[in-house]
Amino acid sequence: NDRRGDLMLLINGMPVIHIELKKSGVPVSQAYNQIEKYSREGVFTGLFSLVQVFVAMEPEESVYFANPGMDGKFNKDYYFHWADFNNEPINDWKKVASLLLSIPMAHQLIGYYTVADDADGVLKVMRSYQYYAANAISDKIKKTNWKDKNSLGGYIWHTTGSGKTMTSFKSAQLIANSKDADKVIFLMDRIELGTQSLQEYRAFADASDDVQATENTGVLVTKLKSNDPANTLIVTSIQKMSNINSEEDGLNSKDIELISNKRIVFIVDEAHRS
């Protein structure tokens, strides 16, 4: 194979980010078209199948996107411009190199902010605003004073189709992996939404049983009390939560003491409705 890419970033000796460069005045589309051509020709096989993220770059514009794999399809809807905290696109190549492609961000992008979606078998990389949101949530939890019963949370306001489900899952995963909370509860306002979200979260997870369902209020109470690490991420509904104090299998005083001593984070989907 005589194909040769422009730049390859290695982490621990493994090729994980491939960068294709074009000179000023040449559209960035030529760079990503070349990456797609290389993929069709089988360049990213063997050792180079480890490449997770592609970057197409010319001095005034850069886009990044996940490697869909040999059997995957490139979709330009998922070619992203990196942006700052205010969602202003960053196009200058020097800023992209320093803010996205340098240590520690390049490590974090590959290690924390890509998701292998089991639903379609395609690797997904998060947009910049998803990164900022998930990072802000996990940082907030890290700094939480759990003894302060009046401690406030926060909200993320993203539009329809912006990837809120992935953002909420990644936030919960970061919190769970950091051990900054004992439980992370995905709270849905409709049972049907809970079923759908459970399927999506399990598709994002490393293993399907990393995200726990709650068939009824009794199961919810049991998993809230549990010290098993497998019961850290839980999907439930407002209905089941509200039934805790009214159903026969709800809480007793001992349960209340056990649960109140745990650090519990609630992530509420469609919070404006509930």
Regions found by a protein language model. Name each.
Residues 1-183, 188, 192, 196-208, ...:
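ATP-dependent helicase/translocase motor core
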Residues 40-42, 172-173, 218-222, 250-255:
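A generic local structural motif
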Residues 63-66, 220-225, 245:
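Short, solvent-exposed polar/charged micro-motifs at secondary-structure junctions
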Residues 159-160, 272-274:
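Conserved helicase ATPase motor motifs in RecA-like P-loop NTPase domains
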Residues 191, 213-223, 238-243:
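Conserved helicase motor
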Residues 208-215, 274:
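Acidic/polar loop patches that form or flank catalytic/metal-binding clefts of enzymes
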Residues 217-234, 258:
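Conserved motor-coupling elements within RecA-like helicase/translocase cores
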Residues 233-268, 274:
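Conserved RecA-like ASCE ATPase "motif II neighborhood" in helicase/translocase motors
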